[in-house]
Each structure stands twice: as structure tokens, then as C-alpha cells.
Amino acid sequence: DVDENANQVVTAASAMKVTGFTPDTTPPTATGFTMNLKAGEMIITFTQPVDGSSVNVDQLTLQDHATAPTDAGSYTLTAGTKSSALSTEVTITFVEADLNKIKERAFCTKTNGIDDCYLSFSATFVDDATGVDVSVQLGTAGVKATVYTADDIAPELVQFVRYNQATGEITLSFTEVVDPATFDPAKLTL
């Protein structure tokens, strides 16, 4: 107590039974997220601890607007590595296929940063520590990114895949998705 008197010991044999119990029914709510396209990951922050092992990555959709995302401006993740700890933050590391789809879409762009980077998800995305589903974040009320890190690593040519002599077309493979409109064949040496 305040006078530094020790508390009385209560043994297991003399333990007191609880007289009333109110379970936690308050769902966790997302407060924001960081998008790091250079590292290929996002970190979502919640109002209370969530169980990272309950994360369903395929319930996450990235979109270009908080409300009414365009068809080209939204993408639902298919897979990814997730943090499994009990925490107020969940880290999702994108699989290569999803990361390339994100980079080729019209959202979370280098030009607009956080201004076109929103997130929505269903109630089955994650549970809190007591098993309560997260508050639904509808596509009509997306959570805005709070921090954005652009992918500033240039793609590298991985392989010369094939050459079609009849059409004069070549196929090249790169380390990540590229914008074909920026390709300058005059700078290519065979």
C-alpha cells in the first residue's frame, strides 16, 4: 500500500472466486498503416493488441481512394508473410506476384505517396487477443496510409527470353514489373 505495507498472501487453497466477469467485446480498429514498396511490406496499426497468427492476408484490399475506388485502382492481396506476435502492429510482407501487381496499378504511387494509398478489409482479417473480430474497414471508408516509402530501386534485366525472327520481337525478363511505355529500344544493344 502507500505506507509500504506488504499485501496478505492468498494461497491457491484460499483463492477467492470471481463474483462477476465482463468479457472484452470491443473490436480492434485500424488507425493507419505504413506502405514500404522498397522493402515490399506494410505495417498496420490497431487501437489494441491483435493476434498476428489470426491474420488472413487475402482479406486485405489496397485502393486508390478512401471511398469508391476505381476498378484499376484496387487490388486484393493473395498471400504474404505475416507477423505472428500479439501486438498493436501487424507486418505483412508481400509475395512477389502481389508486389508486382501493386506496382503496376494506379494506387500507392510514387507521384502521390499517401494521397492515393488506402486499405480496406473484412471482419475476418484479424482477431484481437481474446478472439474478437477486427472492425470492418469497408472499401467505401478506406484507412489512409500514414507513411509511404517509394520503390526507388531500378529494375534489372534478368534474362533474354526469346527472339522471334519472323516478327522481330524480343522478350526480356526483369527483376520486377516494368512500364513498357518507358522502354527505349534505341538504347538496347544485341
Regions found by a protein language model. Give the residues of each.
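Non-catalytic beta-sheet/beta-sandwich ligand-binding modules that flank or precede catalytic cores
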Residues: 1-190
